[in-house]
A protein has these predicted regions:
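Short, small-residue-biased leader/transition segments that mark boundaries at the very start
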Residues: 3-7
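Non-catalytic, structured segments within soluble enzyme domains
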Residues: 77-211
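Membrane-embedded segments
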Residues: 10-40
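Membrane-interfacial and juxtamembrane segments of integral membrane proteins
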Residues: 32-34, 70-78
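Envelope-exposed proteins and targeting segments
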Residues: 8-10, 27, 47-51, 72, ...
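A short, charged, and often flexible helix/loop element on the N-terminal side
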Residues: 62-68
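Solvent-exposed loop/turn segments at secondary-structure junctions
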Residues: 18-21, 28, 45, 61, ...
């Protein structure tokens, strides 16, 4: 069978930027929709960022949400992508090593150990889907749990993601059978963090729609 480490990487790409290997760093329609929503709400309500833009933001720029920073972000992405300063494969590798997966948890390897006491290549499919779902709102991961189990609304989320993975040939329909959020068991150091924070807030945070 294929290595689940590969499925893990592909699921993250499907979640964050499915067209990463095919675009030049920008998705004009996503940027346009983001700007329209930001103007309507008079705040930075929607990202519209490609994986390339997220990488540049995390490596080169501050996290401040300003128009000037967004323009700087787009300029650096254009320079990197248009001049082919590095490969897409290398960009994705760096992204996996620096992306945030929880409060002060950075990189896929650290995150896998933090939540499951495993290396990324050892994760099962249910764990891969959970890990990919964290990236859009890493600081809100505690709100996804009742105790140490994912909240019931993850059922629909998993169904959508599994259907997408099967449709795109990333997994077989047989591999999707029995993959549910109920099978996700937090066994790493995150167990202590989640236990300590569960009683602090009743806030709910549903998984984001995947790109």
């Amino acid at each position: 069978s294929r290595g689940l480490g590969d499925v893990y990487k592909r699921q993250i790409m499907q979640s964050e930027d499915a067209g990463f290997f095919y675009h030049n760093g920008f998705i004009p329609s996503a940027i346009r929709e983001s700007l329209i929503q930001d103007i309507k709400e008079r705040r930075f309500a929607r990202g519209g960022s490609t994986l390339s833009m997220q990488l540049v933001k995390n490596v080169f720029l501050s996290r401040n949400k300003t128009i000037a920073r967004k323009l700087e972000e787009m300029l650096i992405v254009w320079l990197i992508e248009s001049d082919h300063l590095t490969s897409k494969e290398r960009m994705f590798e760096v992204y996996l090593n620096i992306a945030e997966w929880g409060p002060m948890i950075y990189g896929a390897a650290e995150a896998s150990r933090y939540y499951f006491a495993k290396e990324p290549s050892q994760l099962n499919l249910a764990e891969c889907i959970f890990m990919a779902s964290i990236i859009p709102k890493p600081k809100q991961v505690r709100y996804c749990f009742d105790g140490l189990r994912l909240k019931p609304y993850y059922e629909d989320f998993y169904r959508v993601i599994l259907d997408r993975l099967v449709d795109r040939g990333l997994i077989s329909s047989e591999e999707a059978v029995g993959v549910t959020p109920e099978s996700v068991e937090i066994t790493g150091p995150a167990k202590e963090y989640l236990t300590a924070t569960q009683s602090r807030s009743p806030r709910s945070s549903q998984p984001l729609d995947q790109k």
